[in-house]
């Protein structure tokens, strides 16, 4: 009974057990061998286990194989000579001849003829006897030589009374013979597995026909110098399977292999059948197959895909064989799987862009030496193999950031400056929008400075209280508007060349002037934008649940909708002096405050200094958005929405806008799609490089703020892309011990569960993190410190996780959005459900996780960061 437990154990556990018994418990070792012989041949699954055990017991080395071959040859010769002598003696004595002859015939393998009735001479007996003695002497000499070889290679204790030389060499020979048999069987299976599959190309068994769509078009033809108009039916090309038995057989093979190529784990359950049907539908739409062909392919695939072929069964047998498992375990040990799990560290990066050497930037020595390196930490088991890094706070990165993020827009060695807007274009085309916002907002009060200070966390709060006291004694002056910039320490997905970004804050004294007016009135101003557009437009004020419902409602307004994403490359850099003045006109129109008007005027000309390493950088720029200003987010939304409203008004189209600053999506009717081809040239007049992304015609394919709509239990919700798993597995925070790591995992998990309840894959990932943290409790302040600003926006204060079942409908919707089919979703979820994420701090730099991004259909060049 005890030995039977080993059948289900790992190969490593079995090998360790055998080694321990052989060295210390010989009686158990021999009992185990007898038990193996008893179960051998009774059950095929047990035979594989028996072979694996005997392989571990043998532990054969190369030198033994040569000795075993020679020993087998010599032993055969001795046995043949002995049996022949025995036969001759029997014939001489005329007793036991039949038995002796049978023994001789067997030992000589039937290769030597010896008559039954003959009487050998004494001389013949002596010759055969001498030959046997000579062979025995040679065998003895061989055994002496073999014993010395064993002593040299394996030490004196290896050959002993429990493991004599002859038994060992016979075992080696048997194992080698079995290995040869296995090699022949493997070659046979390999030939079957790697035989080419005869799959014809789709075009060989289908044909294209033109069919009438039922619609008519007006055709103008010239006849006798006059134009004649008449209606003709609109034709459409469709593809169908040829009406022959050969074509249908070829189509059956083709669709079966095509679906299996997409997903080889499909079986006969409800979800698999739905997945098969969707794959067939997608293939049919791609190749424009007619409904009859689609129906036939669906029927074939539903029957053939879930039934494994003999090749599928053999493939699974090979993959799950004891030898294959043992080899994988050995590789796991060599890869240190289990030993390198935990929180790893990656060093910061240096931007690959060259220094342009712009004269506008002055670099001086003498500053206090500052830290350069910027490490990032990541969970080795869940980062999906996605490489995230943070920029080093180096002089090179600082110069690249200033040159490429403030002054120039090119990616090469030449200085290419941002486009300038046409004269007075903002006031000429967007004056009406400015006035509409002012009217919609109405009166806004100025809030107490103490309230502004108390809205920040402890560290900033003290600095704001100090600034408030300072303003009481020294009035605001222009120097308060000077900017002290620094490199933004953020996670960059390293899929392309990156220029680090800058944060450009002004003094706390300056922020109090603007913050007491603008910060607490921002929502009111954003709702005014919604009122001008006639529907919710600025979606940053809504959580991902409400965002999804709003976007779905916008989509459903159109009979044949299309979504056009708008990519505003480096928006802050393109905000010109003219754009800033237009934005400031809204604030001044609302508040009519001279102190705020003066502070806003100081945003036009920016004096900036920056400390990095032991250097100080100074530069001056007119216009441009300073990313640390109180009005950065709100101002970008006002400018973008104003330009978009004017553009839609100019086109005269009905459209819906989804905006979150520089991130925009336009939803309109497909008939209007071509009207937006001139968007780049239009926005170039305003000084912006605006590029339209590829239009999408399915709601689930609409991407907004790195999220897509997914129908969860019948209600649309904005769900982050699967690569967010890799991003949430990295942190810029310092981690000193395992308790810090568990706190980080708990904070990320709690927020992730709120956003992703009922979402395939993501819910399991965050449950895995939360479980691995030991369900650790963390403070609200720590949660805000861990999660990014974007995640906090999506939450909108939510902290309660409402458990939601994952339905088949939700799985199909997630598939439409992210390309991960329902069966793959379940496989990934099972992986996370069985995973415990280690909180051990590791010193290694890079490890390859078990679950990688390719399984989640994450493209290698799909980055969250713009250049």
Curated annotation (Swiss-Prot):
<comment type="similarity">
    <text>Belongs to the luteoviruses RNA polymerase family.</text>
</comment>
<dbReference type="InterPro" id="IPR002166">
    <property type="entry name" value="RNA_pol_HCV"/>
</dbReference>
<dbReference type="InterPro" id="IPR043128">
    <property type="entry name" value="Rev_trsase/Diguanyl_cyclase"/>
</dbReference>
<protein>
    <recommendedName>
        <fullName>Putative RNA-directed RNA polymerase</fullName>
        <ecNumber>2.7.7.48</ecNumber>
    </recommendedName>
</protein>
<dbReference type="GO" id="GO:0000166">
    <property type="term" value="F:nucleotide binding"/>
</dbReference>
<dbReference type="Pfam" id="PF08467">
    <property type="entry name" value="Luteo_P1-P2"/>
</dbReference>
<dbReference type="GO" id="GO:0075523">
    <property type="term" value="P:viral translational frameshifting"/>
</dbReference>
<dbReference type="GO" id="GO:0003968">
    <property type="term" value="F:RNA-directed RNA polymerase activity"/>
</dbReference>
<dbReference type="InterPro" id="IPR043502">
    <property type="entry name" value="DNA/RNA_pol_sf"/>
</dbReference>
<dbReference type="InterPro" id="IPR013674">
    <property type="entry name" value="Luteo_Rpol_P1-P2"/>
</dbReference>
<keyword id="KW-0547">Nucleotide-binding</keyword>
<keyword id="KW-0808">Transferase</keyword>
<dbReference type="GO" id="GO:0003723">
    <property type="term" value="F:RNA binding"/>
</dbReference>
<keyword id="KW-0696">RNA-directed RNA polymerase</keyword>
<dbReference type="GO" id="GO:0039694">
    <property type="term" value="P:viral RNA genome replication"/>
</dbReference>
<dbReference type="InterPro" id="IPR007094">
    <property type="entry name" value="RNA-dir_pol_PSvirus"/>
</dbReference>
<feature type="domain" description="RdRp catalytic">
    <location>
        <begin position="561"/>
        <end position="676"/>
    </location>
</feature>
<comment type="function">
    <text>Probable polymerase.</text>
</comment>
<keyword id="KW-0693">Viral RNA replication</keyword>
<keyword id="KW-0548">Nucleotidyltransferase</keyword>
<dbReference type="Pfam" id="PF00998">
    <property type="entry name" value="RdRP_3"/>
</dbReference>
